[in-house]
């Protein structure tokens, strides 16, 4: 049985600890607060020095914040395949993917260098999965990422022009570290669509990275954009500043996996 003095000391210590936990919550250090409470219930923790115990609390809070930040970045990217990752890419012989090239791109050095990626392949080749895998790799490096289909982007830009916020939208896209444009130039664009598309591509050039996912060879891109000389200039810069990945394959990935 503890002596009366020892009981008083324990009660005071508990009050101090609870006050500390309350302040941690008020400072939005909830993970640290929870871990501190767990330490209070762990008799073995007393074997550690104060610095060691404090270091554990800081590490746990830091890790939780990093994980939460990563989740927010991935969620805001709007990936259609949120579980895609480069580790799960299938390197079947018929796909002729360069494992070393993909591993190098997964380091995201190309983003730091403001380069682009072009992914080419037929319908069902796995372009969207590979695009999302590169996007999630970028998220893991805490780059901002946005996935969007080109038709949806053109609709967004058209609406922005009508509402008088076109410049604001363009400025927003200039801040995204990696913009993934899926279904790139599947069909010819109108004059206004061509103008809007070239505007956003030009605004991002040499400032940030873009991933273009397309069924068609870059040699045929220009004929789908109305703005002739300007289109040629912009597209030429895109192509010469990009890493190109061609996904081949005798069967589509959907057929391989039994997806209709």
Placement of each model-derived feature along the sequence:
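Conserved P-loop
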Residues: 97-175
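Residue-level preference for the first positions of well-ordered beta-strands
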Residues: 116-118, 178, 209-211
């Amino acid at each position: 049985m503890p002596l009366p003095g020892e009981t008083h000391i324990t009660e005071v210590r508990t009050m101090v600890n609870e006050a500390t936990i309350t302040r941690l919550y008020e400072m939005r250090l909830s993970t640290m607060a929870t871990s501190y409470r767990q330490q209070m219930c762990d008799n073995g923790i007393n074997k550690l020095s104060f610095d060691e115990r404090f270091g554990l609390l800081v590490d746990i809070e830091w890790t939780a914040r990093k994980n939460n930040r990563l989740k927010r970045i991935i969620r805001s990217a709007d990936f259609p395949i949120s579980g895609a990752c480069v580790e799960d890419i299938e390197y079947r012989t018929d796909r002729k993917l360069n494992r070393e090239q993909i591993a190098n791109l997964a380091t995201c050095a190309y983003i730091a260098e403001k380069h682009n990626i072009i992914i080419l392949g037929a319908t069902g080749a796995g372009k969207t999965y590979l695009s999302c895998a590169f996007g999630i790799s970028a998220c893991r490096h805490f780059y901002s990422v946005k996935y969007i289909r080109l038709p949806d982007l053109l609709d967004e830009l058209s609406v922005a022009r009508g509402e008088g916020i076109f410049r604001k939208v363009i400025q927003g896209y200039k801040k995204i570290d990696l913009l993934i444009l899926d279904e790139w130039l599947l069909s010819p664009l109108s004059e206004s669509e061509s103008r809007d598309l070239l505007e956003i591509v030009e605004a991002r050039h040499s400032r940030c990275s873009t991933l273009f996912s397309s069924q068609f060879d870059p040699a045929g891109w220009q004929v789908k954009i109305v703005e002739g000389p300007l289109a040629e200039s912009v597209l030429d810069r895109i192509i010469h500043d990009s890493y190109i990945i061609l996904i081949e394959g005798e069967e589509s990935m959907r057929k391989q996996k039994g997806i209709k």
